[in-house]
Amino acid sequence: MDILSDPILGRIRAALDKTYGANVERAVLFGSRARADARPDSDYDIAVFLKEPDSFWQESGRLAEIETDILYDTGAVINALPLKAGRHREPSAFMEELTRDGRDL
């Protein structure tokens, strides 16, 4: 999959840049869309690594605003997960999946 050609991913990245600016260390698409085995109605799973995050709930609220705006305009379902910068280097099954299948936005 060419993630640059997906307008939803472009919109997600632009919204992250507008909301967080340089605070985003990485934004990683994972799940079925990253593996290129998604159905047309599959959601977009995005891990957002933040250099200086507020609480998990505050960041989840900010990301929910982005998710809702895009859902309202396009019908695309986005599940964005806020994570502290550097967590992608931690050993866990989830981080192994991100390393194996993830696509940086």
Kindly give the residue locations of the regions a language model identified.
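Catalytic core of pol beta-like nucleotidyltransferases
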Residues: 1-26, 34-40, 51-105
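Short beta-strand->loop micro-motif that forms the acidic, two-metal-ion catalytic signature
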Residues: 44-49
